[in-house]
Amino acid sequence: MLSKSITRSLKQQVTKKSLSKAIAPSIARSLATSTPPSPSDGLKPSHVYTKLSHTDDPARSRFFQYSWGSWLKDDALKKKQRETIFSIEGLTAYLNSVDSLRVPETAKLLQPKEEQGTFVLQNNLTFDVLGAKSDVLLIKSISSIHEGKHHRIYKLTLSTGKDLVLRIPYKLESDTAIASKIKSEVATSDFLKLKLGLDVPKIIAYGPDRNNAIRSPFILQEFIEGELLMKKWNPLEPDSDKTDEDLKSVIAPIAEFQDKILEPVFTKFGSLYFYNDVTTELQQNGEPYEGENDEKLLKRWRVGPSVEKAFTKGKNKLSQDVIDQYNGPWDASNPEQVMTSVAEIEIENARNKLAIVDADAGDVTSKDLLQHQITTFEHLKQITPKLLNSKSPSIKNVEELFKPRLYVPDLDPLNVIQSTEGKNYFIDFEGSTIKPFILSSYPKFVEYQGAKIYDLKVDIPGFDEMDPVEKQQYEFMYYKTRNERLWEVELNKHRHDLIAVASPHIKVLKSPYLQALDLKHSKDYLYVEGAIVQLQSMWEAYVANELVKQDKDDKEFPIKYDEKYLDQYQLDLSDHQMETVSSPFSATGGWIPQDMFRTLKEQGILVEVGEGNYEIKTDKILENPPSETGEEPKA
């Protein structure tokens, strides 16, 4: 039977075809970019039993298949991209060879050792990670413990009683992009542990590609026993002293971690790599930060090309040679190039797709849509060099805000494990980059780009008389505002010198760049254009106060819009927002948790229409509305 909450949620999306004009623009983007919920405990895959020696066991394929959700469109293709096939036999033999590379814990710090197409961090092959040294290290069991957005996580139980984590990336990007992200993430984690002394799991080995015994790119690391900090995060709880305390108990440790990673100032913009994972030219650029006096850390890391998602996500049709023209690294004296490069690679990507369409090479993307994308990203490229004045006298501590600092995009309670020892271990540093702090965004779990509501009864006239659905919409906006404000309080507490990023004007000025980093849908370029258009009314004031990099005598807005263009833009944006807020599961990209997917199919609400595509039968939802008395609907 379809649960009341699922039915009501779908029914509201079907019957309430529009939100009030005051709300729709502010929450549509938030809905469109929200993170799909983690599957509940009841969604864990069923057990698959197989012997390590039974290589032809047909049951094994289920062990590698994605099972925590389904998609409304291209379901088969998207699941195929998320298959994580690897050699169980190869892993067993490889792990035993890695165990033979242990060095005394008193040994000097070594560079990652190349081993069978992989790299081993020998200093992390310790008793607390692998257990006691034995003649043969065996894998007793392998279990799948998480299927995330970008990786699948397996838990390996060893004959020594210790556990390891094997992380296999999905095939969502090019092989080169996956390799670069793995190399950079491992180096970043190594830097956080060795240089900053932060609590992160020890990584013992990594393979940037599938040319190894495991036959897959991977990261092999220490298993941390504990609970996710996310279990304590209740962002939509009504105000109370307890709510305030609970929210701060989650925000505070993440803010403290950010404070520590902001300490080092780097010599270039880009991403971190091990010394031997960058070109000879980049090796010769010198240390990634100044003032290193610890000899064992010299020549351990270097700044290389950025692995920020703008340079990897959705760029499969671009050659790596083209991507390398835009992904850095960049000199510390040129922070504007960090922004401009994002606009340039999006222009190149759209033009390349347009050329494929013109050549009739099978790409079905709308030609008009691609031309609109190109126009918008050309606008972004045109305005980017002027967006923020790195010498502005009106921005407090402006020089500090533009210095190269480490940015971790996935600071989130989902990526914090509270260990049984009481420590907060941080995981998942994929896509970390070195950029000006002023160009970073808040962590997604607290970030809110919509209209701010600080007091429901003061800011929203007639709130008490509204119907429950309308109240919920405004309450959502209020809670998002509250949570972001709590984050800013913590930021100010730790880094008062960087608090200027909380200025509404700074947020508005960098919004076009941040929107370009957060493209999830082919029409999300409209949010980039909207962020640029929004600047027009305040531009003259920004020029006068030297917030933007434009001569004070030149008050003209850099982009020349005509009325026809703006009218069409507003129409397109409204259509896109309406599609977002009125289409079931649009906020998750059409992804549905597997238990809900199964239930909807059984109820006849979800119907397969061929080629791995499904559609929602809205009439079925309306036939079986939830009871207002709190009872389950009748079958």
Curated annotation (Swiss-Prot):
Q: Which residues form a coiled coil?
A: none
Q: Which GO terms describe its cellular component?
A: mitochondrion
Polar residues bias: where?
1-17
Q: Keywords in UniProt for this one?
A: Mitochondrion, Transit peptide
Q: Where is the transit peptide?
A: 1-71
**Location within or outside the cell:** Mitochondrion
Disordered: annotated span: 1-49
Organism superkingdom: Eukaryota
Q: Which family does it belong to?
A: Belongs to the AIM9 family.
Protein name, entry field: Altered inheritance of mitochondria protein 9, mitochondrial
